[in-house]
Amino acid sequence: MVRAVVATLLVVLVVASCVSAQLNFSPGWGKRAAAGGEGTGMHPPAGAVVPPPSSLAGESCGTIPVTTVMHIYRLIRAEATRLVQCQDEEYLG
């Protein structure tokens, strides 16, 4: 009887150590819609299609400097490197 309890506890601990999860919460989560069903005005109702602002539509954006794009690329690459290092430390440690 004691061995069965210990074995079950050991299996639960091994499974729990192998499982990882991530929770994401949005700012509008859990809030009820306004009386008109339009939401709070801060966020569109779920499933609603929001057209882009006129300043973003079409060709009015202009060109983006290459230096800006390269800076963003370097930031993303640095963060990806940090994530890989953290994952390696987690798996090895």
From Swiss-Prot:
Stimuli inducing this protein: Temporarily up-regulated under high salt conditions.
Homology family: Belongs to the AKH/HRTH/RPCH family.
Protein name, entry field: Red pigment-concentrating hormone
Pfam families on file: Adipokin_hormo (PF06377)
Region described as Disordered: spans on this chain: 34-56
UniProt KW keywords: Amidation, Cleavage on pair of basic residues, Hormone, Pigment, Pyrrolidone carboxylic acid, Secreted, Signal
Domain of life per record: Eukaryota
Chain positions found as Pyrrolidone carboxylic acid: 22
Tissues expressing this chain: Strongly expressed in the eyestalk and weakly in brain. Not expressed in other tissues tested.
Propeptide span(s): 33-93
Role this protein plays: This hormone adapts the animal to light backgrounds by stimulating concentration of the pigment of its red body-chromatophores.
Any GO CC annotation of this UniProt entry: extracellular region
